[in-house]
Amino acid sequence: MPAANPKLPSKASLRSTGRPVSKVWMFSHECAGLAQAGGLGEAVAGLSKTLALDSKLDVSVFLPSHGRHLDPSIRESYGLQGLATFIAQGHRTGVNGLWYNYLAGMEKGSRDGVNYFLAKGLDSATSKWLDDPVIYDHEATFEKMSLLARTVGSYADYLISMGRARELPDLIHAHDWHMVPAGVLVKQRLAERGMAVPLVLTVHLLSGVILPWHYASEEWCGIRDIPYSLRTNVKRVSTLKFSQIWQDVCRNSLEKFGCYIADYVTSVSNTYLRNDVSTYVGNTIRGKSGHIYNGCDWNPAIIESSIVAVEFEKIRPGLIDGAPKRWDLREYLLTKAISKIEKESEIKGPARLRDGSRKKEDGSIETFRSDGPLVLMTGRLSPQKGVDLLLDAIPLVRSAIPETKFLLFLLPSNDSDLTKTTLERARKYPDNARVILGRHPSIYLLSHLAADVYAMPSRSEPFGISALEAMITGNPVVGTSVGGITETVVDLSAKGESGTGILVPPENVAKLAQSLVSLLTIMQLDELGQRGKRDDAGISRKILVQSMARMVAKNRNLGSKIRENCRNRVAEKFRWTNAGQMALNRYSVARSLALKTLQK
């Protein structure tokens, strides 16, 4: 039974405390291992894990179940159990004046030191939304956002009523626009009780969502229309109601509202924060914003040993010294391994789409007839990622290096027309291109160990974890000069032999193709050297970027140096432990700002 008079910390004690953050509630629409559609899920899982294991914080991740609590394998691996004494119930009032009842609960589990709370439906009307397995669907997404906000708000009230206020967070970290209602709601509920719990909002990707105040209000998501001390610029603080902030200040922008209410705003790269987020939101985040990089903890040695054991054992006896080289892995991947993708049932991806390109009658992906330099691309199938630009570049690259292969692992979206168009375009190059929808885990990793160059032709890229996955496995990146790519990839044209790839202007297919040809040739020359062969065919003449042509003239093994640069850059700067330390610094500032706000 709830405690009659729950004992809460006094305002005075909360204002004066200087203790560091120790308990964090993460709010996210997705999380790797449970329900993931893209880099957001990877970021939330990686940051939560390092904060829990390396920084020893008590971290809890809250997200809609998306029906994952019904999966026996997930229940077992996360130890999920229903919270028997917690129920979130009530009604939401629609713009039509009708009541919509909801009845929600939560499943709790843990993994790698992190607690996970999955909001689920306890009746058919609520389960229809919270347990919908499609992570992103227009109507369902907004329903999940609202119901999750209601559920976590009720959970905070539940802990207080049960005399368990010590389980409440020291800090709330909301990830992306989907979690603005939940983050603001819990912050508001705790502030009403004198608890200065800071809200950190990370903008992973701007969406420009515009909604009426009714959506966020107490009628629907649950945010009360009470006065709030809002800092509208660096020096000025105004007291406005939440509806005024939403409508008059933020012009019904969900993301602007979140940034205004948050005590601290972060994004995943400094470039994206300053050039995109700040431009969109305005000066209000000056003095309360900073970036937190994403990370990658892949261990190439472990990956290689496990992949070789699983995928490569059959041809090991044919190797001279028993140890496969990169070109051995590549030949095996292109001429044998990719045929396994449809035969085996490991493919994973949204909606389990498996309509890969060049399929054989038995449903498997058709292998290439020969080996060749390999360009790899991975990521979501969306206009943002520029898959169409890479497909445009194929004939240009092929004219210079006819044997080049392009392998694209793409996570499909709900845009069936885009999927169909992409597959049709790839089929025009049967000797050069394969598109694989979803991920076959072992083949996906093998492709990183086997590739020569990684392509990242994004039109916009807040960070781009895939660039880290490429570089840690020794793949130089040809990427567009946008967002986080400019901070992860060191341009060979500008930094010489210390570079990790080439940056090209966005939407410039000619430059993209030219850079791919130049970097592929550098890697081919290095491979010839490792094999003890000479450049009798004069392929070095294909290097079209003159600064790199001069570097290769001095060092024919430049490719090996670039691969080493790639691995070192990720290992030294972009591990999740690095991201965790950045987050702790941002949390400290957010806590100080929240305490100052409460004192006003």
Q: Could you say what each language-model-derived stretch is?
A:
Residues 2-600:
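Catalytic cores of nucleotide-sugar-dependent glycosyltransferases that transfer UDP/GDP/TDP-activated
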